[in-house]
Amino acid sequence: MQVGIVARKGSERAVAVADELRDAVAGAGASVWLDAETADALGEPAAGREVDALADCDLAVAVGGDGTFLFVARNAGDTPIVGVNLGEVGFLNAVPPEAAEEAVVSEVEAFDRGEMNVREAPRLAARTDEWTSVPAANEVVIQGARRGPGAGIDYEVRVDGSRYAGGHADGVLVATPTGSTAYNLSEGGPLVHPAVSGLVVNEMVAEEGMPPIVVDADATVTVAVEGVDEVVVASDGRNVTTLPAPTEVTVERTTPPMRIAGPPSDFFAALEKLS
């Protein structure tokens, strides 16, 4: 079994936890490596690998916050991920540092027995006829090059071919249940429990918008954009592409889903940390 461990960048605590986990995993009989930046922080550059090697692992471990988990997910493909939470909200990272060794070693042992329990969470991709985005675990945002007065886009949103909304807005956001607690929430969208199979469609500061709606997880959401020379499409706020407009951007669920190992997080306990 091969395990890759990634620590939050710039966090001495995360690096220390990752180092302890490396020893514990090796002691359990698995092959284990650290990401290059964590290995450098420990003064062991030869022990590090690039994060895209996570896709070839049997288990990935993210040590930090939800941002670290999403960073790992972008590189892990369908490799299961265990998240160690260092005191942040922790919708994805369920394991506290004091329980990290036991939780990760337990997953190693479960893998050896062929009994690893993995949960799946949907990911989204945006596309046009000529382009496809990087998968997003939280949300895809389609917006103008600028937000605010005098900016934004003219748009029409269709769900499975039926018109849902249209007009002028800063943009349109499509979120997974995982992403409902992130950017979607700050844009006035609803919380969606992770057990719900659905997607959120949320207009961003629309002049005459519809309320946000939760649609089927397999729905196809199409956003037609005009009134601007270009449109910006962002996956999880980090992978940003500028496309010429007018255009149509289609957002739908993609494969592989995000695969999560280890104990599940308590959704409602995590919500309390938002207040």
UniProtKB/Swiss-Prot annotation:
Predominant cellular place of this UniProt entry's protein: cytoplasm
Domain of life: Archaea
Keyword NAD listed: yes
Gene source species: Halorubrum lacusprofundi (strain ATCC 49239 / DSM 5036 / JCM 8891 / ACAM 34)
Keywords, sorted A to Z: ATP-binding, Cytoplasm, Kinase, NAD, NADP, Nucleotide-binding, Transferase
S-S bridge residues: none
Subcellular location as annotated: Cytoplasm
Cofactor or coenzyme needed: a divalent metal cation
Gene3D superfamilies named in the record: Probable inorganic polyphosphate/atp-NAD kinase, domain 1, Probable inorganic polyphosphate/atp-NAD kinase, domain 2
InterPro entries for this protein: ATP-NAD_kinase_N (IPR017438), ATP-NAD_kinase_PpnK-typ_C (IPR017437), NAD/diacylglycerol_kinase_sf (IPR016064), NADK (IPR002504)
MF terms in GO: ATP binding; metal ion binding; NAD+ kinase activity
Family stated for the protein in its record: Belongs to the NAD kinase family.
Amino acids binding NAD(+): 66-67, 138-139, 168, 170, 181-186, 205
Matches recorded under Pfam families: NAD_kinase, NAD_kinase_C
Catalytic reactions on record: NAD(+) + ATP = ADP + NADP(+) + H(+)
Record function comment: Involved in the regulation of the intracellular balance of NAD and NADP, and is a key enzyme in the biosynthesis of NADP. Catalyzes specifically the phosphorylation on 2'-hydroxyl of the adenosine moiety of NAD to yield NADP.
GO CC field: cytoplasm
Name of the featured protein: NAD kinase
Catalytic residues identified in the record: 66 (proton acceptor)
PANTHER family in the record: BIFUNCTIONAL NADP PHOSPHATASE_NAD KINASE, NAD KINASE
EC number(s) given by UniProt: 2.7.1.23
